Amino acid sequence: MSENGKCPVTGKTSKPVAGGGTSNQDWWPNQLNLNILHQQSSKSNPMGGDFNYAEEFKKLDLKAVKEDLYTLMTDSQEWWPADYGHYGPLFIRMAWHSAGTYRMGDGRGGAGSGSQRLAPLNSWPDNVNLDKARRLLWPIKQKYGKRISWADLMVLAGNCAIESMGLPTFGFAGGREDVWEPEQDVYWGSEEEWLATSDKPKSRYSGERDLENPLAAVQMGLIYVNPEGPDGNPDPIASGKDVRETFARMAMNDEETVALVAGGHTFGKCHGAGDAALVGPEPEAAPLEEMGLGWKSSHGRGKGGDTISSGIEGAWKPRPTTWDMGYLKVLFKYDWELVKSPAGANQWLAKDVDDEDMVVDAHDPDKKHRPMMTTADLSLKFDPIYEPIARRYLENPEEFADAFARAWFKLTHRDMGPRARYLGPEVPEEDLIWQDPIPAVDHELIDDKDIADLKAKILASGLSVSQLVTTAWASASTFRGSDNRGGANGARIRFAPQKDWAVNQPAELQKVLQALEGIQKDFNAGQSGGKKVSLADLIVLGGCAGVEKAAQNAGADAAVPFAPGRMDALEEQTDGDSFSVLEPKADGFRNFQKAKFAVKAEELLVDRAQLLTLTAPEMTVLVGGLRMLGANYGNSKHGVFTDKSETLTNDFFVNLLDMGTVWKPSANDEDVFEGSDRKTGALKWTGTRVDLVFGSNSQLRAIAEVYGCEDGQEKFVQDFVAAWDKVMSLDRFDLA
């Protein structure tokens, strides 16, 4: 054997080096995955801890970037020629597929992180040849560097593409920060085969056609629906049902869906010029010398008129690089016949086409083609709900243009959160209901003396530490770092649906809110100037006062940070249906689970912690502290490993780790455990899976041991206060 085949250290035949070999996950596939809590660390980010993207973006000459993008649109490159001499449709598809991974069920996906650059999205079958779009953008990204992220640039390129083809957009907001490693927290499905149909193992469908939550795409590797129809079956009516379900899960209603489909397909064409078997591997599987590009095709020239992408071939309308009513006009004007594309895909061609509606070839001006529609397109004509909407848009071009512009803005900005995060000169002034608007601060804020006085009044109101802490947690912990929704700002906990969620114990919640509203009313009425306190601030302040009181009960003097400035949203600013997805079906921090789930309780806890942007130590200290503060749902004693009441001690960890206790499952509930004295057999404690995992899981136990040591009390209080403040402030983008 050649010396080159041997390890330079051991001299043995080379094997995978650092990070290779059989992994813990291979040995123990059911091991709790805590890695999702430690993604995107400073160790993977080349920009450094002091880098402030928002400040850099503010220095960007956005107008100059847009001019460069407009120029690029028609600067066709030989290595990847532009269809019809215009890259606009390609960039629209790139931006659309960047944003289109968003699903409202858990808020994950979307354009906000630039993750299309990384696996798995850079190699998804539905993203075929979008690697070329990003490579075309590289000179512009290279020119402006750190002042514009890839995430922002991809969306901006889509906007400029639309504008360059004749439609003014609704606006653009910057502020999306790039990630630098693949996102591990996003569940894309369980299938082990790209584009697996619903009859394959580990399908995302059950029942007649019930799509697994929180997924929105119909197949692994697709962004939306299968354009050929459900599982490739060319049935427009059935396709309409898929389209409706998928777009609804992306937070789009029927009118927005029709506008997006019809508006998006006003531009460009599909590519299926030949046998898909001639297309090479995706970027992540491509040879090193391809330099990050994939899908190299040996069909003809492999580009231009020989391009193979989706497998469907053709354009929807006569002028594919101009905003007009051509798509809807052609859709309703003609009957359609089912054919196979050169790549073998199901598609539809218009019958008996007038010459004026024939489409000039994208690369040969001497050729013309009949307009094409996908099965999904035809759902706009045959679905009984979509059809009248589409006809109305056809008859009202201005309404259609406005509907598409607004829906496109929503599509590309949905995961950014509130307007407070928007940057740049093109931010629309209009408040939109899906942005969860909150009134701007219009009064003088409370000062340190007011804060101290209000805390004293709250503690003297008769509300317990448990009530104060639980209410503040219920308000703030709705936040999702995935799409920056939820949180305490706005005090929407007083409105439906949040006030009625089971986890919030509605009757108990109303008592607390009424008491706090009384304190708010008295304080505001007693001010001679314009000073006020919002209920949103008072809810959080009450929680902070409760934590401080519990720390005092433990002999610690803890000052919990508090920054006023939250405002109270109006009920008309609150879309109840939209907020319903924020309801916790399980909240391990409150030892709550609405029902039995196939997923283990500790996995649901980690998922929730990740949405709250918590690390494993933060999750650990919060669970241990909240148990001591009486924050359990229904005043349950599960996990309350202490004989003290409302006292912020490290008893949870001390007693959890006590070898004098032996644990066994409860005879009444397999997810509840009983801890008995090892010697006497006397019952000492009860706990759930969420409680015991901090003693069972080796990584979490290592953290728990830090807080369970004799010198752990002080650090426990400090770390709990810091983690508490983090959760209370997650939505305070105004403080950034």
Swiss-Prot record:
Cofactor(s), names only, from the UniProt record: heme b
InterPro entries: Catalase_peroxidase, Haem_peroxidase, Haem_peroxidase_sf, Peroxidases_AS, Peroxidases_heam-ligand_BS
EC number assigned by the record: 1.11.1.21
Catalytic-site annotation from UniProt: H97 (proton acceptor)
A GO molecular function held by the record: heme binding
BP GO annotations: cellular response to hydrogen peroxide; hydrogen peroxide catabolic process
Keywords recorded for this protein, A-Z: Heme, Hydrogen peroxide, Iron, Metal-binding, Oxidoreductase, Peroxidase
Membrane-crossing residue ranges in chain numbering: none
Signal peptide span: none
Cross-link (Tryptophyl-tyrosyl-methioninium (Trp-Tyr) (with M-250)): W96-Y224
Cross-link (Tryptophyl-tyrosyl-methioninium (Tyr-Met) (with W-96)): Y224-M250
Site (Transition state stabilizer): residue numbering on this chain: R93
Residues annotated as binding heme b: H265
Self-association state and partner proteins as the record states: Homodimer or homotetramer.
Similarity section: Belongs to the peroxidase family. Peroxidase/catalase subfamily.
Described purpose of this protein according to its UniProt entry: Bifunctional enzyme with both catalase and broad-spectrum peroxidase activity.
Protein name as it appears in the record: Catalase-peroxidase
Gene source species: Desulfatibacillum aliphaticivorans
Gene: katG
